[in-house]
Structure formats: structure tokens, C-alpha cells
Design a protein with these regions (language model features):
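Short, acidic, Ser/Thr-enriched surface-loop or helix-capping motifs
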Residues: 71, 163-164
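Radical SAM/AdoMet-radical enzyme domain recognition
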Residues: 1-89, 95
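Short, small/polar residue-rich loop motifs at catalytic or cofactor-binding pockets
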Residues: 154-158
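Cysteine-cluster motifs in flexible loop/terminal segments that predominantly coordinate metals
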Residues: 205-251
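A structural motif corresponding to the C-terminal lobe/cap of the Radical SAM core domain
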Residues: 70-71, 75, 89-116, 150-153, ...
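A structural signal for short, well-ordered beta-strand segments and their strand-loop junctions
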Residues: 49, 78, 116-121, 162
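C-terminal accessory region of radical SAM enzymes
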Residues: 98-143, 168-220, 225
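Iron-sulfur cluster-binding electron-transfer modules in prokaryotic oxidoreductases
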Residues: 21, 68-87, 103-107, 120-123, ...
Length: 252
């Protein structure tokens, strides 16, 4: 793989030990195989990212999982906050309160962690981090220079798109809203002009709490989770408990 040009390896670990990981995955031996892959990556000097799924079941094990991560020599720990759809529909999402506490814990870890910590489908981590930085008396110029302050907001249909096995085009792999098909449509025109793509890039079209949130450009909420829960990808992310003031809608 390295000879073919692979520059980074990404593996999934959903438990702090073999018992927890294999039980969650439902396949005995996967933890051991993953640990072997970690060793292979290090032998080839491949930077390594570990992905962990955040669910109601895995949440209590995350502190122990973090201790494991510190022993693996990784460059990044990416926590994917479950969206109950597709293959994940049989799993339980965490609630808004747990999400908020987890984001604060991750921010605390980020100060001393030997690797980068990031979230997927939990952009409200950026809002938590900014609130914490302001509470620590960081000025906004300094915050803007951090990785959080340079955040890109919603990426679905905004710099990325997803093409399924049958050619169907979606704004992202987690947002299954059909916009066309590469066999019959111009993919560039779909990205540039399809109403789904243009509305995702225009945060003034967002609704509810996300639509009036001062952090919408840096966060924007999970469009995939909004779609899974409400059927409308422009609605509020139900996992974020933040209630913005009515007067804080983004500028047109």
C-alpha cells in the first residue's frame, strides 16, 4: 500500500480492549487484527488515525479508550458521533446532555493530548471550544488562529460530494439526498447549481436554532443528523443543546 502511494492509514477501534471492541463489532478477533495493522503502519512509518464510534454503548468506555490511544503512537483520534440511519439504525445515539459533556471533556484532553483530537458529525464541538477559549480570556484574534477558529463549518456539499456505487450523487456519504447521477448529469453543474448543494453552502437558509446561531459559519450542525431526525437537512441538529438568542441570526 505504501509503495502504491498511501500516505496515511485509518483504522477503527470501538473499545478499550478486545472484549469490548469485538463484542461491539460482533466479530471475534477484530481487535487483535487491528492491533496487528497498527504495528504494520508503524513499521512502514505510515501516520495513523484511529476512528471511534460514539454511541450510548461506547460512551462510558471512552476514557479507557483514550488511555489506549496514548499507547498506539497515533497522529489523530477521530470520534464519529453516531447518526441513527442505515447500518447504524440499530444503535443508540447519545443525548444532547451527554454530547455537551463529552465535547467539554474532549476540549480538556486536547490541551495535553499527544495527538490531535477531532470530531465527525459533531461540529458543535467548535462552539464548545470557542466558549471555553473565551472563558479562558483568549481574545478573538487568537481564537481565529487556532484550528477550531479556522474551522470550515458544514462540509456536506461544500468542498466535497459523494458518488455512490450506482453513480448517484449525494452531498456527502452521510447525507443520502439524491441530486443526480454521474451517468446522466454533469457532476460539475450538479455541484455548482443544484438547489441541495447551493442551500447547504448558504447558511442563511438553515432553520431553527442552527439558523439563528452566531456560530453557524464555524459549526452549522450536522446536516445529516438533521435529515435523519426530521427529513429536512436544513433543520436544527437535535444533538446540540445550545439555544441561541433570537437576535443572533447570521448576516445575509
Amino acid at each position: 500500500l505504501k509503495a502504491a502511494g498511501i500516505q496515511t492509514m485509518s483504522l477503527s477501534i470501538d473499545g478499550s480492549d478486545a472484549i469490548r471492541h469485538d463484542e461491539f463489532r460482533g466479530v471475534p478477533g477484530t481487535f487483535e487484527m487491528t492491533m496487528r495493522a497498527v504495528e504494520w503502519a508503524h513499521r512502514l512509518d505510515l501516520p495513523l488515525q484511529i476512528n471511534t464510534l460514539v454511541t450510548d454503548e461506547t460512551l462510558p468506555d471512552l476514557p479507557a479508550a483514550y488511555e489506549l490511544m496514548k499507547t498506539l503512537g497515533i497522529m489523530r483520534w477521530s470520534l464519529f458521533f453516531l447518526i441513527s440511519m442505515g447500518r447504524g439504525s440499530g444503535l443508540r445515539e447519545i443525548g444532547p446532555g451527554d454530547s455537551e459533556r463529552l465535547n467539554h471533556w474532549l476540549y480538556d484532553l486536547s490541551k495535553t493530548s499527544p495527538f490531535q483530537i477531532k470530531t465527525t458529525e459533531a461540529t458543535h464541538y467548535r462552539r464548545v471550544a470557542i466558549e471555553r477559549m473565551l472563558a479562558e480570556r483568549m481574545d478573538r484574534a487568537a481564537i481565529a488562529a487556532t484550528s477550531v477558529g479556522r474551522g470550515f463549518g458544514v462540509r456536506d456539499g461544500n468542498g466535497i460530494m459523494f458518488v455512490a456505487y450506482d453513480g448517484t450523487v449525494h452531498p456527502s456519504g452521510f447525507l443520502p439526498v439524491r441530486t443526480g447521477n454521474v451517468r446522466s448529469d454533469d457532476i460539475v453543474e450538479l455541484y455548482r447549481t443544484h438547489p441541495v448543494f447551493t442551500s447547504l453552502r448558504d447558511v442563511t437558509t438553515y432553520k431553527g436554532r442552527c439558523g439563528r446561531c452566531e456560530h453557524v459559519r464555524l459549526c452549522g450542525g450536522s446536516r445529516a443528523r438533521a435529515y435523519a431526525w426530521t427529513g429536512d437537512f436544513l433543520e436544527s441538529d437535535p444533538l446540540c443543546p445550545f439555544v441561541p438568542p433570537l437576535a443572533s441570526a447570521p448576516e445575509q
